[in-house]
């Protein structure tokens, strides 16, 4: 399972899978909760559930690296600073450094910013990064162990 209406990452991955596989699922991404077309139709519910499983399989096969940043969430938190600047640094939106592999699913995304940046994010992909954040990232990596 999973819930693409509760995870923007799942939403983007699912939309790219739909585009790649040339599958039509008109209710995908509609609303922040399941619309009546899904709630009232066992067929639509089953179709979304099957696609959620496909998204889970795809995400489950990914290699993920995480860094522990033990502070509270918020726009001025250390984790927000690291996230914002890491996205800006890695994005190919402003100055392509290294493009995503040819097999990267994001090439099929209906979202131009995802295809252009080579990241699953939409926020911060067109910003410049502050190199000072690398010190904070290094500290977080060392603390993560």
PLM feature spans:
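Boundary/linker segments flanking structured domains
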Residues: 1-145
